[in-house]
Amino acid sequence: MMKKIDVKILDPRVGKEFPLPTYATSGSAGLDLRACLNDAVELAPGDTTLVPTGLAIHIADPSLAAMMLPRSGLGHKHGIVLGNLVGLIDSDYQGQLMISVWNRGQDSFTIQPGERIAQMIFVPVVQAEFNLVEDFDATDRGEGGFGHSGRQ
């Protein structure tokens, strides 16, 4: 059975002027989130800003979390990514979804009201329960770290 997540519309334009978040295709993992702005916002190279979505969610289920991710086209074509690289939404958070947008590109970029600026996915959560041990069971890799497995 598919899980349902409560969404609270904070801005009356959402669902009318600005479409509700949607999956672009039947195979899409991420919901597109839109900039719920009154006016366009220009981001100079290197600038960051917080952009409201006009939405709040309450996941409520502690076995789930949401992640906000950049849209691949904005990042690749314009250098527009998330200021915190990935946004994590805990199951007990109930506030507005805000997108930290960073222009890592070389040119100014204008975010238009209603523009799709990020995507959100839901992921399972596993919380660690730590055990103090003297040693781990041996593996082929052992303590090999950065670059240990080679490039080819």
From Swiss-Prot:
A motif (Motif 5, important for activity) lies at residues 142-152. Belongs to the dUTPase family. The keyword Hydrolase applies. It catalyses: dUTP + H2O = dUMP + diphosphate + H(+). The lineage of its organism: Bacteria, Pseudomonadati, Pseudomonadota, Gammaproteobacteria, Enterobacterales. The keyword Membrane does not apply. GO terms for cellular component: cytosol; protein-containing complex. Changing D90N: Reduces catalytic activity 40000-fold. NCBIfam families: dut, PRK00601.1. It holds the Pfam family dUTPase. This is Deoxyuridine 5'-triphosphate nucleotidohydrolase. The C-terminal 11 residues (motif 5) are important for function; its removal by trypsin decreases kcat about 40-fold with a less than 2-fold increase in KM for dUTP. HAMAP family: dUTPase_bact. Signal peptide: none annotated. It is found in: Cytoplasm. Transmembrane segments: none annotated. This enzyme is involved in nucleotide metabolism: it produces dUMP, the immediate precursor of thymidine nucleotides and it decreases the intracellular concentration of dUTP so that uracil cannot be incorporated into DNA. It comes from Escherichia coli (strain K12). Keywords: Cytoplasm, Hydrolase, Magnesium, Metal-binding, Nucleotide metabolism. Its cofactor is Mg(2+). One of its GO terms (biological process) is dUMP biosynthetic process. InterPro entries: dUTPase (IPR008181), dUTPase-like (IPR029054), dUTPase-like_sf (IPR036157), dUTPase_trimeric (IPR033704). Homotrimer. It is an enzyme of class 3 (hydrolase). Its main location: cytoplasm. Pathway: Pyrimidine metabolism; dUMP biosynthesis; dUMP from dCTP (dUTP route): step 2/2.
